[in-house]
Amino acid sequence: MSGETNAPATSAQATGQPRTAGAASPDSAATVPGDLRMTRLLWPFMLASAAGLVPFTVYSTFLVPIADESGGGVAALGQLRGLGGLAALAVGSALAPLIDRVRREWAAAAGLAVLAASAALGASGDFLLLAAFCLLVGAGTAVLNPALTAAAADRFDNDAAAGRAATLITATQSLTALLAAPLVALPALVWGWRGDLWAIAALCSVLALYFLLRGRRKAGPGAEAEAAGKAGQPGYVESFRLLGTLPGVLPLVLVAMLRTAAFMGYLAYLAAFYDERFGLAPGPFAMVWTLSGTSFFLGNLFAGRLLSAERARISGERLMTLALVVALAALVGVFFTRSLWLSLPLTALVGAAHATVAACVTTLLVRRCGSLRGTALSVNAAGMSFGVFCGAGLGGAGLALGGFAGTAAALGGLTLVALVLARVVARSSTD
């Protein structure tokens, strides 16, 4: 039986009725396509997902020359980046129910159009327009990422394949985060950072047109059934209420938020830790950063593959709990170890464990939320944006109060709370 479908998945949740937690869908035993076949089907979604990460990568990579050009100073431009997180939180929360009420392709096209406009504004180098750039990038990705993830999941008619499709999108994002810096630095040798932004503006414009036309092509056979399904969707406020009644969904969103806060807080001070503890300069530390990024990508990729197996040896709830235990132990271990050769594998473990948790959250949200998955993924993305915003602050507070041991305590505490909530999610699957 083929796992692909051209219509959005339908379930009891299309009318707001939650599926019994832990219950398999009628076709959950269907064959899950291989990664290569999925990639051939989903490459436009994966490319758009990768493109969404590039604007801020250019901004971070060339922060010093951009600051010189704008006259705003490095510190001021660094603070502008926080505007993107706040915009993502606000837009993601406000528009979450709308992701399920419009065609996913059109939502993705809108997000890409906003990113194209933001890149064009950023290329000006003007301080105020750079502030607008940061706001628009945050807003655009808040719409783009959940729309792409939900659209990829909707291409398949069984839970295992839908979850795998969603995690392939997130794996693409982690791979892009790993490779984007050198990929934007090399072309910049020819056309500068402005050329990078104009190039991403052009790419996002082309992709926006592609998804717009793709959405229009769906107005053929089956469009009436899809329109009827959209008409049967709950209202704006009702979507939030129904999402809260689905078993384990709210704890899952909180797990994602806390995990993100802990991981981003850890990354914010990792370079300072390796410099103070082991005397690693920025050059050698780049290898540590690559190790962490590679571990995150591989953890996300293989966790998604494990969860999509036809006969998974471990449930998503149990794997998430185990990964949080590993993440907690490894994170605390990194900040307390005095050996570089012990710190390096612990750093890799932190990245792989957090990536596994991220894959589990995405998979479980896709499986549990049915036709409300777009709303759920958007709320989840907003929560993660809030986690990014809070993580560095909490890690810094711990550092100020107790050195790196204080940072370990603050971020480890967040992970511990996430672990408790993961057990709540696991219990909800058996209720």
Please name every model-derived segment.
Residues 26-36, 215-253:
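Juxtamembrane intracellular "pre-TM" segments in multi-pass secondary transporters
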Residues 60, 249-290, 297:
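Extracytoplasmic gate region of multi-pass secondary transporters
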Residues 90-125:
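Conserved MFS/SLC helix-loop-helix module at the cytosolic interface between two early adjacent transmembrane helices
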Residues 91-103, 299-314, 399:
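Helix-to-loop junctions at the C-terminal end of transmembrane segments
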Residues 127, 159, 167-216:
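Helix-loop-helix hairpin linking two adjacent transmembrane segments in secondary transporters
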Residues 134-172:
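Cytoplasmic helix-loop-helix junction between adjacent transmembrane helices
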Residues 314-361:
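C-terminal transmembrane helical hairpin of 12-TM major facilitator-type secondary transporters
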Residues 368-404, 411:
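A late C-terminal transmembrane helix in Major Facilitator Superfamily
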